[in-house]
Amino acid sequence: MQCVYVCDTLEPTFRDLQKVKKVKGKTAIPCGEYDVRYRMSMKFNQNMPYLEDVPNFKGIMIHTGNNPKDTQGCILVGVNPRGSNGIVMPRLVSSRDSFNRINDLIYKAIKSEEGVKVIIMNV
């Protein structure tokens, strides 16, 4: 398996689901390794990359967005800007460019039957 940095991501708040309840659209995806497949998205009216078999979650897409309110429980892709103090800002820029890059890689890998996995870690 080849791991390649393509972009940064933004998703909802981490919640330890062993201790607290999931909050729909506001809870980070549990740590784990998930297959990616394409499915039709009614929201975007096109085939989009979705994470498969995430426990207690449905419809987790990888898509564009810039702010935490844009996630609705999905993974947003882009570049985390840094403030003048060097601290990462809780938002994304260049989301569309990042999505186009990652979507192209996902599409090529699935088409060539390599398969694609997303690994979620809390760092």
Show where each model-derived region lies.
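Cell wall/extracellular polymer interaction/catalysis modules
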Residues: M1-V116, M121-V123
